[in-house]
């Protein structure tokens, strides 16, 4: 798994993908986003042990060429799951206050629910202008957990 973060600019994805391709690697899955001027990259890289070693050995070259902080770490094979689970989407909006992500994450952890993806944004209420916190999650609920349905 290649993870990288750095100042956003045009061409960054091309440079990182070229780095991987030039060393024989293949990008299987990826998530990338610009947040407040910082561009974050998460890529599942496929390749032989020699290819992955070459990518690891050359990370300093990538860092120097792109000014991003990058590292390669082992990852589970695609579709690997520690336990049988069911996917659910969880969305919510509330008046903004400190600690909302922690509170939701704490409840989910106590239920042994894994957060697969989470996106949060701060919006402005249309009439009052008050800050509204919005979150959208995909979670993996253990198959043995009883879920209330409307």
Summary of predicted features, one role per range:
Residues 1-150:
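A conserved regulatory-domain signal marking ACT and ACT-like small-molecule sensing domains
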């Amino acid at each position: 798994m290649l993870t990288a973060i750095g100042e956003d600019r045009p061409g960054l994805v091309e440079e990182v993908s070229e780095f991987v391709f030039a060393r024989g690697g293949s990008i299987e899955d990826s998530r990338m986003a610009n947040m407040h001027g910082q561009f974050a990259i998460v890529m599942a890289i496929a390749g032989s042990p020699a290819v992955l070693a070459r990518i690891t050995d050359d990370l300093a070259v990538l860092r120097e060429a792109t000014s991003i902080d990058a590292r390669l770490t082992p990852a589970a094979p695609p579709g690997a799951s520690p336990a049988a689970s069911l996917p659910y989407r969880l969305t919510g909006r509330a008046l903004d206050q400190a600690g909302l992500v922690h509170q939701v994450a704490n409840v989910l952890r106590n239920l042994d629910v894994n957060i697969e993806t989470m996106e949060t944004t701060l919006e402005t209420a249309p009439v009052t202008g008050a800050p509204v916190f919005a979150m959208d999650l995909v979670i993996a609920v253990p198959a043995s957990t009883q879920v209330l349905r409307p």
